C-alpha cells in the first residue's frame, strides 16, 4: 500500500468497507469474475491486487497456474539443490520467500524444510525462488 492503494484483499475490504463475501473482482488475465473459492485461494497465497485503468484485479486459480508455467518457461534463471539455498541466498531458509512453482502459493516452513531433507531443487524464476508445495508435489 505504498502508493495508498490497497494491495492485499483484506486491506481492500477494509478500505472500501466491503465484506469479503460481497467482492466482485475480475481476473487480470481472462477477464472472468473471480469466484469466492479462488478469491480465498488468492488471499491465502498472499498475492497482491493489480490496479490498472482505475480498476482492481485479482487472478483466478487457472490463470495463476498458467502464469506460473509461463514464467517458468520464459524467465527461468537457474536451479539449485535446496540444501545449497541458504548459502546462495545468504539467509536462513525460514527467511527466504519461496513460492510454489505450479500454483504460486507461499511455502510454509515445513514445506521449505521438506525441500531440504528430500533433496529437491529450488528454482530461481524472475529473481524469486520457487519450489513445490505439498499439494502440487503430489500431482507430479
UniProtKB/Swiss-Prot annotation:
GO terms for molecular function: DNA binding; zinc ion binding. The keyword Metal-binding applies. The keyword Transmembrane does not apply. Keywords: Activator, DNA-binding, Early protein, Host cytoplasm, Host nucleus, Host-virus interaction, Inhibition of host innate immune response by virus, Metal-binding, Modulation of host cell apoptosis by virus, Transcription, Transcription regulation, Viral immunoevasion, Zinc, Zinc-finger. One of its GO terms (cellular component) is host cell nucleus. It holds the Pfam family E6. It is found in: Host cytoplasm; Host nucleus. SUPFAM superfamilies: E6 C-terminal domain-like. One of its GO terms (biological process) is DNA-templated transcription. A zinc finger (unnamed) spans 27-63, 100-136. Its main location: host cell. Belongs to the papillomaviridae E6 protein family. Forms homodimers. Interacts with ubiquitin-protein ligase UBE3A/E6-AP; this interaction stimulates UBE3A ubiquitin activity. Interacts with host BAK1. HAMAP family: HPV_E6. Plays a major role in the induction and maintenance of cellular transformation. E6 associates with host UBE3A/E6-AP ubiquitin-protein ligase and modulates its activity. Protects host keratinocytes from apoptosis by mediating the degradation of host BAK1. May also inhibit host immune response. This is Protein E6.
Amino acid at each position: 500500500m505504498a502508493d495508498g492503494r490497497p494491495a492485499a484483499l483484506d486491506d481492500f475490504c477494509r478500505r472500501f468497507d466491503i465484506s469479503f463475501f460481497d467482492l466482485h473482482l475480475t481476473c487480470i488475465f481472462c477477464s472472468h469474475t473471480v469466484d469466492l473459492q479462488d478469491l480465498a485461494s488468492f488471499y491465502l497465497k498472499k498475492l497482491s491486487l493489480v490496479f490498472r485503468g482505475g480498476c482492481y484485479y485479482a487472478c483466478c486459480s487457472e490463470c495463476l497456474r498458467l502464469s506460473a508455467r509461463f514464467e517458468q518457461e520464459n524467465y527461468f534463471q537457474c536451479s539449485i539443490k535446496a540444501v545449497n539455498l541458504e548459502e546462495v541466498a545468504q539467509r536462513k531458509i525460514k527467511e527466504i520467500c519461496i513460492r510454489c512453482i505450479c500454483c504460486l502459493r507461499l511455502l510454509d516452513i515445513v514445506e521449505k524444510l521438506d525441500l531440504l531433507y528430500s533433496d529437491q531443487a529450488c528454482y530461481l524464476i524472475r529473481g524469486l525462488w520457487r519450489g513445490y508445495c505439498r499439494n502440487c508435489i503430489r500431482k507430479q
